[in-house]
């Protein structure tokens, strides 16, 4: 009960990522005091789970009943944006920086000749790839420590999603015969780094003089739904805790002419078509 007033007071005045971190720290201190004389690990585990249950309940209640969000934004309001082209282009062909709130991504562009295309080999086929987008998510991006090494499944998936979003606007080989490689690195994360990498990569391509057909941007749409599913709220530009405690992460990328890539992650049994249509309008 001690933690509820603190959460209710701070959820509307701070970044939700900071609030959840403070809540976890306070919760651990309270648990240490309560269970310092016992070795009942099962009871401690149940108590730890309660924090996440309450945070989940608090985020849903705020969106469904108060029509607002943890950092005070409206449900259809995006975070503050910042974009910059260049900066390190003296050692690379192009670069772009894109900030969306606490999510920061740096993309760099390198151009090569036709002989630099990536060779794709399968059991029964071989092909060449002229445009590549790679995504890196180092541990420090999320405020953690860890091994920095080969690419993991998450990085591969996010990189390929951004690559699919950008491929339709890449110029034809006959007009731009160069091999194009973009590397996006998340330097700070609070949700939607994959979509921020699409924006940063677009800036890097334009900074490097690649004649893309039109700029591409991406955003993540979240969902808060009640237990029965008859009441819901869509959230534009979800941040980390809203992704973690929310019911949907609907990644949508496209241009002024239409959608170029979609990825849907859900935590509920299913999402109604009407909800997806509303998210896309």
Q: Where do the protein language model's features map onto the residues?
A:
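A short glycine/serine-rich beta->alpha loop
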Residues: 146-152, 184-192
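Alpha-helical support elements that line or immediately flank enzyme active sites
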Residues: 107-109, 197-209
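Glycine/serine-rich anion-binding loops at beta->alpha junctions
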Residues: 90-101, 186-200
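Glycine-rich, flexible beta-strand/loop modules in the N-terminal catalytic cores of phosphate-handling
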Residues: 95-178, 258-268, 272-277
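Acidic, glycine-rich active-site loops and adjacent beta-strand->loop/helix elements
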Residues: 111-115, 137-139, 184-190, 220-227, ...
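A generic local secondary-structure boundary/capping motif
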Residues: 85-88, 95-98, 119-124, 168-172, ...
